[in-house]
Amino acid sequence: MRAGQIQARLTSTNLWWAHPKDWVGRDPDLREASDAPFVHSAGVLDDLTPGGLYVLRGPRRVGKSVELKRTVERLLAEGVDPRAIAHMSVDGWVADDLGAFVRAADRLMPPEGRRWWLIDEITSITDGWSARIKWLRDNDSRFRSDTVVLTGSSSSNLRDSVGDLAGRRGPASDPDRVMLPIGFRTFVKLVSRHPPAEEATPPEPLAVADLTPDRLRDAAYRLTPWLHMLAEAWEDYLHVGGFPLAVAAHIRARVPDQSLRLALQGVISGDAFQRARLSDLQTGEMLHQLARGLGSKFNAAGLARCID
């Protein structure tokens, strides 16, 4: 891409540059999130260490783009210069465009001080994005000390590429972040009119290794008054899942709509079965067969015949 094209996109999408006080209401990602019947933030980027290089991975439609914009909101609240934050969705780009992006944005950003680079959909670049980021961290002294957040949808591709970034992650102590769909605990709080009292639930989920018989008995005893509600919420959660789009549709209408079904099928086709090169029809049939066979023995050859 040409520098002028990149700069035009930056000024049209980084709304906080021109409107640092009221950009949130103008931003399409945050505006869509505010239309949801609940407020939810995964908080996976709340503790960025300046100078770190972070990779945030997770399935499509889980809210990574919104999380990036909320990071912008938090940085501005902390007093960061709006022009020191550059956000770009690089869907459809090639690796060389990343270098052009850094050079073009550099001319529009403050000449001194730390900067924040929030690069969305990095895994859409299929010709070596990690090697290009590595080169920039090695050869651009200022970019090397900047805070960089890269997001991607395909965890397998990200895992394959993250090795190239070894030694270039800066002071980040936890550089690899994962954003997953909403868990059952949060789902209950969002959809239930009378969720369990705070004192009835542990402040944080327990690790599997910590689920001793005594702790399980204690938790079951404390949650017994809400057993009927939790059982109903669990059935809903198994049906709805934790993608924010699905949870919002459930809260609004309690029934899924066709557009939601298609959106979530795109998540599955684009992430889970991306390397299988299955058609949408084959993907749908595979999901149907897997759902029918839950709890019974699995025959891979039989499944292959059904989707062939």
Predicted features and spans:
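Hydrophobic anchor at the beta1->P-loop junction of P-loop NTPases
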Residues: 56
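Conserved glycine(s) of the Walker
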Residues: 63
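Hydrophobic positions on the alpha1 helix immediately C-terminal to the Walker A/P-loop
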Residues: 67
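Short glycine-rich substrate-engagement loop in P-loop NTPases that contacts/grips substrate
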Residues: 82-112
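Conserved P-loop NTPase "ATPase switch" module shared by AAA+ and STAND
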Residues: 110-133
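Sensor-1/coupling segment of RecA-like P-loop NTPase cores
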Residues: 139-165
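Interdomain motor-coupling "hinge/lid" segment immediately C-terminal to the ATP-binding subdomain
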Residues: 159-291
